Amino acid sequence: MCVPCRSPMACTVCWTASHRREQHAGRDAGSVRLLAATKTRDVGEIMAAIDAGVRMIGENRPQEVMAKAEGLMARCEERGFTLGVADDAGASTIAGEHIPFHLIGQLQSNKIGKVLPVVNTIESVDSLDLAEKISRRAVARGITVGVLLEVNESGEASNPAAIPRMPSASRKNRYIGRT
């Protein structure tokens, strides 16, 4: 994960490391995408990372998504980019013109409506109930949002917040998508 900082050089270091890892793993060039975690960074610093080539950002806290969204959207638009969930269904999706925006931290159900107009993907969803609520709200808004479920595959009690191992996870994922 690349973390935006005051120097675009840091992004160059992340890209170089990513390309080396792709080669080492025998992956196609460009098949690995970096997500810049923007926690504690202001809009100017995030835009410096975007100007340096970052094409996917993630915020850790829902309130930070809400606080930064308007400024980021305006600055991205000035540069010809769309950010997160575009208002216009016909918004450009040409590579390099759209910046996906992820919520990478925990989400409480009372904040779903506040982040849905902005983020493309919500990571670390730790209950099927929350996933279903996200799905219902997204459908009601006519948008699609990615959801990454946190599943406790090991069954260890050390991660009680995660969804217990599900033998029919793919069937459950299809169900959530239909609500």
Residues covered by each model-derived region:
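Conserved alpha/beta-domain cores
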Residues: M1-T179
